[in-house]
Amino acid sequence: MEEKNKIYLTQETIKKYEEEKWHLINVERPAVILEIKEARQQGDLSENAEYDAAREKQGQIEDRITELENILSNAISIQESHSDKIGLGSVVRILNQSTGKERTFKIVGSFDTDPTQNKISYESPLAKSIIGFSKGDVVEIDAPDKYTTKILSVNDK
């Protein structure tokens, strides 16, 4: 698998996508096939809005199944990190030395990013700047407004 195609996901997200794919294949797909069959029985397909709507829905379902298959075939599961060094899966507590504000977050893959849950992408400027560092290190964050941050803890260590 090429590095650029890898998609880092938590085990929970992998499970969620697998369940969605199963539902689309085993529930949604058969239902839309039935809708198409029923719409065909109404006669002239050239002016059949139900048929057109069902075919469009079928296309959306098939597109989503293909998308999920692509995601899952390229998925790399992010394990909880227990390392002293920051990496994917690490829970990090930092101190912004300019503002004096502390912040705690988990570094995750792009598909798992959720600022409301304090989950940031490993591709974000903050994560890119601190990956590989350890507790006690002071790091310059390469963001639009550069600032320095002190790493207070990594995985509660």
Curated annotation (Swiss-Prot):
Which InterPro entries does its entry note? GreA/GreB_C_sf, TF_GreA/GreB_CS, Tscrpt_elong_fac_GreA, Tscrpt_elong_fac_GreA/B, Tscrpt_elong_fac_GreA/B_C, Tscrpt_elong_fac_GreA/B_fam, Tscrpt_elong_fac_GreA/B_N, Tscrpt_elong_fac_GreA/B_N_sf
Q: Which GO terms describe its biological process?
A: DNA-templated transcription elongation; regulation of DNA-templated transcription elongation
The protein's superkingdom reads Bacteria
Q: Which UniProt keywords apply?
A: Coiled coil, DNA-binding, Transcription, Transcription regulation
GO MF annotations, alphabetized = DNA binding; RNA polymerase binding
Q: Where would one find coiled-coil regions in this protein?
A: 47-75
Q: Which Pfam families match?
A: GreA_GreB, GreA_GreB_N
**Described purpose of this protein according to its UniProt entry:** Necessary for efficient RNA polymerase transcription elongation past template-encoded arresting sites. The arresting sites in DNA have the property of trapping a certain fraction of elongating RNA polymerases that pass through, resulting in locked ternary complexes. Cleavage of the nascent transcript by cleavage factors such as GreA or GreB allows the resumption of elongation from the new 3'terminus. GreA releases sequences of 2 to 3 nucleotides.
- Similarity field: Belongs to the GreA/GreB family.
| Name of the protein this chain belongs to | Transcription elongation factor GreA
What species is this protein from?
Mycoplasmopsis pulmonis (strain UAB CTIP) (Mycoplasma pulmonis)
